[in-house]
UniProtKB/Swiss-Prot annotation:
Function as written in the Swiss-Prot or TrEMBL entry: Adapter protein implicated in the regulation of a large spectrum of both general and specialized signaling pathways. Binds to a large number of partners, usually by recognition of a phosphoserine or phosphothreonine motif. Binding generally results in the modulation of the activity of the binding partner.
CC annotations in GO: cytoplasm
Cited CDD domains: 14-3-3_gamma
Annotated site residue numbers, Interaction with phosphoserine on interacting protein: 57, 132
Family the entry assigns: Belongs to the 14-3-3 family.
Source taxonomy: Eukaryota, Metazoa, Chordata, Craniata, Vertebrata
Stated name of the protein: 14-3-3 protein gamma
Chief place where the protein resides: cytoplasm
């Protein structure tokens, strides 16, 4: 029998050493013990996979940019090499996302009781995020399918969070942040993105007195990110309105 506490300790150690693949493997094992995760364990799982997938997302963006430049040069051999490398990274990224989505569907979301609203929103948000990461690299019908799955998870989480969580709760705010990014970057729907982000920000401002001391730092940081995005997106829209739209 694997010792749960040892696995969690290993994940903490791996985080300090910035060995996120090890950290993710340890937290995957913890999750597969099929018992609910504590808040700390939940965060360890999230941080581990966010770093593992983040490295691949970053690599993919760099290689995609190189691929576009190479295509313009017309060097067939180099184009083929860059394309093959991009596809290798896409495979890795897809495998990581599928790993997380399996854990969410088979253990984490499944094991949430009716009243565990915070955990349910946390995991549904994660589900929306990892389908969104798949959508960033997918094309055609596959993209349409993962976009729909992402939207569905975000939407369900959004409804639960509005009904059962304070507007200043960091998980509710973090969900609004990522859901609005989904609208802006994946759905190419800037108006919906701005509306969602602005509503979340305004609702939180109106209830600042409900800010929990423990989560004050987290909540205010996410509010700042929401405001930064709004500033950027509204200026982008004004630029588009001023000239030809680039959507």
């Amino acid at each position: 029998m694997v010792d749960r506490e040892q696995l969690v300790q290993k994940a903490r150690l791996a985080e300090q050493a910035e060995r996120y693949d090890d950290m993710a493997a340890a937290m995957k094992n913890v999750t597969e013990l099929n018992e609910p995760l504590s808040n700390e364990e939940r965060n360890l799982l999230s941080v581990a996979y966010k770093n593992v997938v983040g490295a691949r997302r970053s690599s993919w963006r760099v290689i995609s940019s190189i691929e576009q430049k190479t295509s313009a040069d017309g060097n067939e051999k180099k184009i083929e090499m860059v394309r093959a490398y991009r596809e290798k990274i896409e495979k890795e990224l897809g495998a990581v996302c599928q790993d997380v989505l399996s854990l969410l569907d088979n253990y984490l979301i499944k094991n949430c009781s009716e009243t565990q609203y915070e955990s349910k929103v946390f995991y549904l948000k994660m589900k929306g995020d990892y389908y969104r990461y798949l959508a960033e690299v997918a094309t055609g019908e596959k993209r349409a399918t993962v976009v729909e799955s992402s939207e569905k998870a975000y939407s369900e989480a959004h409804e639960i969070s509005k009904e059962h969580m304070q507007p200043t709760h960091p998980i509710r705010l973090g969900l609004a942040l990522n859901y609005s990014v989904f609208y802006y970057e994946i759905q190419n729907a800037p108006e919906q993105a701005c509306h969602l982000a602005k509503t979340a920000f305004d609702d939180a401002i109106a209830e600042l007195d409900t800010l929990n001391e423990d989560s004050y730092k987290d909540s205010t940081l996410i509010m700042q990110l929401l405001r930064d995005n709004l500033t950027l997106w509204t200026s982008d829209q004004q630029d588009d309105d001023g000239g030809e739209g680039n959507n």
